[in-house]
């Protein structure tokens, strides 16, 4: 059975996560995709891989995803990137990191290079969907909204 934990960020915010602690070892940090969570096969597969290979493991549900607090509509890539960097800093400390990002999680993983450049040992993007923002959102925006965003 997978045991999930919660990290409090502020008075009302809780982030659900999975962690396999390994001091002085490299950590796999798995970042899920858009509107996803930690219930799928990918995070559990990478957790099992980490355990079998004596690696640390960390995965979180961004705010508004899964059982983490918050509303999905109040989130965005910048917010989830910041949450992720704070979360990694608090949990991984100075250990080296292997980032694995699925779909939007690959984008958020790439953003982590700004914060952990010297700690990142590797990166794997799975179905990184570089066009997902265009297909999911941009094409649905009115001309007025598009012009406002471009300003």
Residue locations for each model-derived region?
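N-terminal cap/lid segment of alpha/beta-hydrolase-fold proteins
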Residues: 1-23
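Short beta-strand element of the alpha/beta-hydrolase
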Residues: 25-33
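Short substrate-entry loop that stabilizes the transition state in hydrolases
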Residues: 35-41
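Conserved alpha/beta-hydrolase
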Residues: 43, 47-69
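Catalytic nucleophile-loop/oxyanion-hole region of alpha/beta-hydrolase
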Residues: 65-91
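Short beta-strand immediately N-terminal to the catalytic nucleophile in serine-hydrolase-like folds
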Residues: 99-101, 126
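Gly/Ala-rich beta-loop-alpha elbow adjacent to hydrolase catalytic centers
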Residues: 101-109
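The alpha/beta-hydrolase serine catalytic core
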Residues: 107, 119-151
